[in-house]
Every structure is written in structure tokens, then in C-alpha cells.
Amino acid sequence: MHLTIMRRFAVLLLLAIFLGGCSGSNGAAEEKWKMKVIWHVDTSGEPFMDLSPDGELAAAVDWNNAKIYLVKPDGESVVFDIQGQDAVKPVVSGVALKDGVAYVLGSYEDFVGIRKYSWNGEVGEERHGWAGSVSDNILRSPSGNHLCYLITIDAGKQELYCDGVKMTLGGDYYFLNSVSDSGVVVISSGDGTHVFKEGNEVLSFNTSNVVAYKDRVLVNEEDFLRVYDLSGNLVGEKEGYTFSLTTLLRWTLLPTERYIFRYEPLEDTHVITWDIKQVETLPGFPQFANDHFVVTSKNGVLHCYSLKDFHEVFSVEMPEDDGLIKLSDDGRVMLVSGENGGYWLYVSSENNF
């Protein structure tokens, strides 16, 4: 009798241990999925691409051939000629998606600015400057609710357009660093940075390594990572936590709602809280992060981790040694580029379209 009870108890104990090992820290099973390539195109030239946060539309520019591809997560795609009726090919400087429309920033035959494309074709232009003007760069906020682009009209004169509102910049040559969901815009020039909100300058720094997340500003100054609010109050700092812009215009520091992901040179990705305390280390370089997932790359493999408990959600081999990464908010759609062109759209194999 007692032996039978003990055997049953042992079986139940082993089952509990097994189930516990298959579950996350909160007792729920760790959700994982496989990704498959649903669409691919070979292109050449500098890669410019975007993926809507909901994963419903991807945009990819064929730089050398002046084309833009729009792709749905079921693999259906359309392609449009960016050159249009122009006698010369445009010099494209970026693309951003907002409300189902791809904004293609470029230097066109007789103007600099934007050509817009929806699924059904070209839907408009935003013309500025003249034939000798230059397009600089374009960014949208993480949710896509704000969109800004920067152009050089003449030597010593630039124009910054954010949600249709123009700001004229003079003197230095500026670069558009960051646009946040709360409308904070960061531009840099040489070793200086200016931070704007609603057209008003709110902060400035003597460094070009500055990014924004909502109403917080992350600054690399004097070998420190410092976090400020828009009133200029220092809310956190850590010595030695430097960051910068690297190849393909990628920051080595990615802020999200709960965590900051920072690449430690020649090492891995450090996961930091907003009070600048390290809580986790992930392998490789931080390629992309949103408020739910982070994607890192190491030894030719992309790894996606859930921000709930940092378990690995999926991993795929990189199609090329380096490139750009965009991931949907739900982690089920991913757009990848090569370093010199070529695009791959991945979707979760469990998705049904």
C-alpha cells in the first residue's frame, strides 16, 4: 500500500519537473515559432527598406534600378518605377512607411523630396529645392505616427520636414538621428546635437551620439551613457557605456519601453534597465528591437528573444554576412536585407493568410 503510494508520488513528481522544464518562469509554456522565407528579390546598391509595425506591408528599394517593391506577408508583391518620366535615375536616400504609404526620399531630376507609393501605385509627391539639391535621410517613429526627413537645399541651408511642418536649418550640415513616438526629433552636426519637440528646441549636447525614446533622451558624453528628461534633468548614468552609429547607419544602442539594448564592442548585447542596471546578456549584435522583441546576430545567425523573459522565440541563418533587420510588433514578420542589396521577407510558418 505504502509502496504503491510512493511510486505514484514519484511519477507525479517527475511529471511536474518535466512540465516545469518546458514552461517559462511564470509557469506558462514558452512560445516559440519557426520562420520561413515567403518572398525574396535580388537587387544591387545601398539597401533601403521598411516594415510596418503590424507587419502588413514591407517596402524595399532596388537602388541601382530605381524600383520600389511593396510586399504583403502572404508573399504577394508589386513593383513600381521610382524614376517615372524623369530622364535620369534618382538618387534614393531612404524609405519609410506610414499609413500604408511608402515615402521614398530622393534627389529627382528637377527637385528633391518625396515620391509616395501605395499598393495601387504612385499617390503623390512632395517637391522641394531644385535639381542641384540633395536628399539626406528619412526616419519614422517606432509606431509610425511621426515621419521626418532632411534635405539640403543649397550649401549651408537645409530643411527638416516633420509631419508636413518645415524647419529651416543653417550653418552646419545636419543629420537626422532619431524620431520618437512622442514627437521628439534629434538632429546632429559634427560634435553637437539639437533636440526638438513641436518645433521648439528643448535640449542641446556637445556630442553627436544622441537618440530619443518617447520623452527621454539617451546621450553618450564624456565616456558616460546618460539619460535625460526633456527638462534637462539627469535621470540615470553609467560610466563606460558608450554607443555610436555604425555601418548601415545602425545605432549600437536600442531603447525600448522596459529595456535598453547596448552592444559591448567585441562582445555581446547588454540588456539594461532605464536606471542603468544590467539585467541580462544576449549573444551578438543588437540588430533591431521593439517593445516586445529584440533581434541579435552572431556567427551568421539571427536570434529573436521575447522581452517577457528573454527566451529565444526563433532563430534563422542570415542570408548574407550583414544587413538590415525589421521585425513586426508581434514578432511574426521579419524583413532582412543584404549589405549591398537583396531582400528576404520571413513570416511565421504558423501564419495562415
From Swiss-Prot:
InterPro entries per the UniProt record, alphabetical: Quinoprotein_ADH-like_sf, WD40/YVTN_repeat-like_dom_sf
Organism: Archaeoglobus fulgidus (strain ATCC 49558 / DSM 4304 / JCM 9628 / NBRC 100126 / VC-16)
Record key words, sorted: Signal
Keyword Signal: yes
Residues annotated as signal peptide: 1-28
Protein name: Uncharacterized protein AF_1353
